Amino acid sequence: MAAYILVVDDDPDIRSLLRLHLASAGYEVGLAEDAIQAGYMVLARAPELIVTDVRMPYMDGFEFVAALRADNALPYIPVIFLTSVDDGDHRGRELGAVGYLLKPIRADRLLALVAQNVPGGPVPIG
């Protein structure tokens, strides 16, 4: 069974691109357009890893991860933060992020970081 990764980004093009990269590498991918939708998805099925944008409407990525970390009923879920602004990764590291990637996303960096932090990894394709 492929590792399940949840992608959270308000930009549909970014969501599609990340799904393409991750699914092509053999991961199962869930997509959420904001942190509110992602929260419901996590409660329904906890992913092995979350890739989330920092700047989103309603609730930013930092607030989303802080809410996850505050819920003791949820398992620890590794998080990779995405941002288009190089404003440092201090807040993300405080929340226990395993990585911080600048947009535009390089597929090789994304996949390497995911592989380092997902138990079980992808399912071989073909």
Give a label for each model feature.
Residues 10, 51-53:
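Active-site T/S-Asp motif of two-component receiver
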Residues 16-24:
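Charged docking surfaces used in two-component/phosphorelay signaling
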Residues 26-33, 41:
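Short hydrophobic/Thr-rich beta-strand motif most characteristic of the beta2 strand and flanking loop
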Residues 34-37, 60-66:
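Acidic catalytic/metal-coordinating carboxylates
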Residues 45-51:
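Active-site beta3 strand of CheY-like receiver
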Residues 56:
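Receiver (REC) domain active-site loop signature in two-component systems and cognate sites
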Residues 63, 85-102, 109-112, 116:
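Alpha4 helix (beta4-alpha4-beta5 surface) of REC/receiver domains from two-component response regulators
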Residues 80-82:
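Hydrophobic/aromatic residues positioned on beta-strands within the core alpha/beta folds
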